[in-house]
């Protein structure tokens, strides 16, 4: 009875082994399909990450298809082997099931590691650029826009550390006007000097003409060899004071203007100009000499102005020639000096050393009261 019971129990074990093997083969077959594809995708992603060339879609080559076909043939071979054993008589040790389960676990672990590496090194389809790169324009990237700017009727005012747009009205134009800087001492000196130089140029020319006219009138009234001096006194005594006053005024302005060109603020520079016969220095010297000579004959001009027929104390008879001859000669010399000085000035009217000195002068600007308050704030 014991033998028969054991014999009855043994055939019941064999179909269980077949089922276990069939289940294992079914587990292996679906897992064997995507494995090579995953491996190829991992290799392709690694190659794309290692090469720094622009990403372009790579066409699917035939090698993965061949591998799939090989895998399919392998599965067909496995099925053929299973068909060779219709009865399911497979000579395997009882530990084959445990080894298959261990292999499946290892394969799953390897698949998990490959999936993680594929996720880390893989390239998404959105990152692949299929379009051809457009050529970059040769213009600079920071070039100014070609469109013209148009004025707008708004002004941005900073309030509470923020810029706010406000409408620009005519009432607020005065507030946004540019404030002109205040004049300093140098600016005032430059303006005064330029204005006085224009007046001086006019006085130089007018003095030269007036001195020549004055000496011509005196010689005409005195006659040849000064024989008609009483006629000169009678005709010229009403013009003596105005003529001499105007001559003195023009000589004073011309002398100051000539010395103003020499820049007497630097004595060494002025002395060098006199020694080198500079035109501005020579003109100033000639005007100064003419002014001194004109002042030396001021008493004679007073006598001519006070000439009466009844006053014999100022003009005793017979002394007209002795009094008037030096006065006429001095006026002639003054006319010559003034004319020569005007020629020197006219040759170089733009030469002005004082203006150059003022331009090079540095002025210390002191802060205003408004600036002090701003600095304190």
Curated annotation (Swiss-Prot):
Pfam families: TMEM237. One of its GO terms (cellular component) is ciliary transition zone. Residues 1-124 are annotated as: Disordered. The keyword Transcription does not apply. GO terms for biological process: cilium assembly; convergent extension involved in gastrulation; regulation of Wnt signaling pathway. The chain crosses the membrane at residues 198-218, 239-259, 273-293, 326-346. Disulfide bonds: none annotated. Its main location: membrane. It is found in: Membrane; Cell projection, Cilium. Keywords: Cell projection, Cilium, Cilium biogenesis/degradation, Membrane, Transmembrane, Transmembrane helix. Residues 1-11, 43-64, 74-87 have a biased composition (Basic and acidic residues). The keyword Transmembrane helix applies. Disruption phenotype: Fishes lacking both tmem237a and tmem237b display defects in midsomitic embryos, including shortening of the anterior-posterior axis and small anterior structures, kinking of the notochord, and broadening and thinning of the somite. It is a multi-pass membrane protein. Component of the transition zone in primary cilia. Required for ciliogenesis. Belongs to the TMEM237 family. This is Transmembrane protein 237A. It comes from Danio rerio (Zebrafish). The gene is tmem237a.
